[in-house]
Amino acid sequence: MQSTQPIQRCALGSQQALPELAVSLLDNLGLITMTGNDKKSYLQGQVTCDVVSLEADQVTWGGHCDAKGKLWSAFRLFHYGDGYAMLQDKSAIDVELRELKKYAVFAKVEINVSDAILLGVCGVQAEQAIAKLTNNAEAAVATFAQGTAVKISPQRWLLVVDANQQDEVLAMLATAPLCDHALWDLYDILEVSPRIPAFAQNEHIPQAVNLQAVNGISFKKGCYTGQETVARAKYRGINKRALYRLSGAIEPSAPETTISLERSVGDNWRAAGEALVSYHFDDGRATGLFVLPNDLEPETQFRLAGQSEQLWQREPLPYSLDDE
């Protein structure tokens, strides 16, 4: 359902402060739901996180792998209705749904793509706004009359609402501008949040997008698809990649333009990969998340593919890559 309120692009400069309060329409993200008597045991055997220990008021990162340990999706998991919900990149959701359902015929589970509307409330005033909406900003997952609120990070909340109640919820948040998903993407980039869009499916193991660093991998749970590869990456040190944020100047182009980088190798340049998610500022700069070798020298240079004069820089990670 299309909102009756106008949706705007939240125009920001690279040195500009983020809005104190804004709402993003998250139409580039999707939600897979799982219900049924066997939902917990079925999902536990499919994903990297510990579903059994997830409390009703908690949210966790997780990954779903193929048999070789390559990711179909990276998601945030939380209790929703009578089951679970997995928030992830919408472009990957059709393939992820097919793979997640592969063994469902042997279990009492229903797995579907939700048609709920996803809204992102963000900014330093987000928690205060959520407290008024739900009367409960203490729990990371809280239900209210129009839907479910999920705490993503200190300044971000996800709202899952029925389509016919979207405008009612937006009216309750009327002091916040309604923006497109780009602002939420920028928060994901600044927080270096794992993301697997369709073009990156079956390309990376969980540690290559830092799932271990955001507590998205349990090394104490039982078996799950791809576990052998994930365990080897931890205990034998076979993982050679990690997720990084890079920033730099970019020639004027549409916000949807794909950003690809090259990295210096001696006197030559080599393809470094495509941004999993990116954001274009209004002052000729951009930033994005890239999977890169985790042993690059500090002096390694980066440049935009096709714009060789535009050098980019790695930004500090907001967390440690250790999983201890």
UniProtKB/Swiss-Prot annotation:
- UniProt: folate binding residues: 184
Instruction: Give GO terms for biological process.
Output: iron-sulfur cluster assembly; RNA modification; tRNA processing
* GO CC terms of this entry: cytoplasm
Q: Does the record carry Cytoplasm as a key word?
A: yes
Keywords for this protein: Cytoplasm, Folate-binding, tRNA processing
Instruction: Please give the coiled-coil regions recorded for this protein.
Output: none
Cytoplasm keyword on record: yes
Could you tell me where this protein is found in the cell?
Cytoplasm
Q: Which GO terms describe its molecular function?
A: folic acid binding
Q: Which HAMAP family match?
A: tRNA_modifying_YgfZ
What PANTHER family has UniProt attached to this entry?
TRANSFERASE CAF17, MITOCHONDRIAL-RELATED
Q: What does this protein do?
A: Folate-binding protein involved in regulating the level of ATP-DnaA and in the modification of some tRNAs. It is probably a key factor in regulatory networks that act via tRNA modification, such as initiation of chromosomal replication.
Q: What family is this protein classified in?
A: Belongs to the tRNA-modifying YgfZ family.
* Protein name in UniProt: tRNA-modifying protein YgfZ
Organism, per UniProt?
Answer: Vibrio vulnificus (strain YJ016)
